[in-house]
Amino acid sequence: MTKEDWEAVIGLEVHAQVSSNTKLFSSSSTEFGAEHNTQVSLVDAAMPGTLPILNYYCIEQAIRTGLALSAEINKYSYFDRKNYFYPDLPQGYQITQFFEPIVKNGRVFINDNEKEIRIARIHLEQDAGKSVHEESKTYVDLNRAGVALIEIVSEPDLRSSAEAAECMKKLRQILRYTGSCDGDMEKGSLRCDANVSVRLKGSNTFGTRCEIKNLNSIRHIVQAIDYEIQRQIEILESGEEISQDTLLFDVASGKTKVMRSKEDASDYRYFPEPDLLPVEVSQEKIDLIQSSLPELPDQKKLRYIEELGINEYDANVITSDKAIADYFEELIKKHDSKLAVTWLTVELFGRLNKANIDIVSSPIKANALSELLDFIVDGTISAKLGKQVFDIMFETGKPASLIIEEQDLKQITDKCQISEVIDKIINSNQDKVQEYKSGKTRLYGFFVGEVMKLTKGKASPDVVNSILSERLG
């Protein structure tokens, strides 16, 4: 058998940190980067006698996420205890939703909306703390303990690492659009576990799955899944059996390694959380959240293509990130969509990529670029000079109006002034005038270039072409 005879079966468990200022069951801050153990309440530290108080904002964000994924909202849900011991889990259990999650039966589309990935459930749970390793010692930081997580669990509908990466990107995109999570994988706001198994193509039986924990970048998702697929195929082809293990991905070696034997639900002894009441959500509340949802990426993309005439590639690029889409929306409030696309995707993106920064960190905000386009559209400066102004704006952060004034870049539109320049050039180059009239029409560019040279690029191209065509016959 060859690799082509096998089929991968993959499901994702995506952990998204809720964009909330406080934790799921306490008023402790969730700000990133604080000193160790400075954002820990008595509840987070599991001090005896303390009781959790539910942050209902997190419930609303879970519902927003569910609605954005066309899921069913459970009007009656409750929390459970997942019992296990780990040094950074002070309670000795995690408060999660096992039996009755807040959301179920959703879907997300990948591969240009050609493939549907079913979402089995979305539930809320609290994050654990973090173990900090220094030389021969390990410390526990509880700043993250109790932070609210939305866990999105897909059905095993993915068949390759590329599809898994695409699914993760799409979920991150939707989470950012809804505002439920910032999607920052570098800061740990978004990570996923991948359940991977393989089977012979055509088989309806699932193989033994292994779970790869805590994948925190798209690249690592692809690398880890690809390695695990190949590892399992090699084991099965050698006649051995797959052991149901929980794995970690070693970035340095590019390999998955056994962390522990995979647990079943019974190992965690789930039971309802006795310190929290069930969560009841009215239809009115669901409708209110539904009405507050923004235009989602697929809807926005369709509008850009059908109403604004933008090609599919550019529409994909612009809607790929909410920050980019917001920037574009600001530009098209005043300007033609195609002009906005060019300046955003070619001029701005080119400079951002060169500087290795994203649009959020751009030194040129949307209103500043819009002002520059105003000057180009009304003829104050030419598009060519506009690019020079744009460079200075990018380097200095100065507004276009100030740069145009300081550099004396206002376009010359006075016909008499431009006529004088053209007459001077024609009188000084009679030989080239005769050659042009004899059929060497390529010399037209020479005359335009001379005009621009004498006017330092400030002559209006439209006026120059109008007068020059008349003079040269």
UniProtKB/Swiss-Prot annotation:
It comes from the Bacteria. Keywords: ATP-binding, Ligase, Nucleotide-binding, Protein biosynthesis. Gene3D superfamilies: 1.10.10.410, GatB domain, N-terminal subdomain. Its EC number is 6.3.5.-. It catalyses: L-glutamyl-tRNA(Gln) + L-glutamine + ATP + H2O = L-glutaminyl-tRNA(Gln) + L-glutamate + ADP + phosphate + H(+); L-aspartyl-tRNA(Asn) + L-glutamine + ATP + H2O = L-asparaginyl-tRNA(Asn) + L-glutamate + ADP + phosphate + 2 H(+). One of its GO terms (molecular function) is ATP binding. One of its GO terms (biological process) is translation. SMART domains: GatB_Yqey. Allows the formation of correctly charged Asn-tRNA(Asn) or Gln-tRNA(Gln) through the transamidation of misacylated Asp-tRNA(Asn) or Glu-tRNA(Gln) in organisms which lack either or both of asparaginyl-tRNA or glutaminyl-tRNA synthetases. The reaction takes place in the presence of glutamine and ATP through an activated phospho-Asp-tRNA(Asn) or phospho-Glu-tRNA(Gln). Heterotrimer of A, B and C subunits. Belongs to the GatB/GatE family. GatB subfamily. This is Aspartyl/glutamyl-tRNA(Asn/Gln) amidotransferase subunit B. It comes from Wolbachia sp. subsp. Drosophila simulans (strain wRi). The gene is gatB.
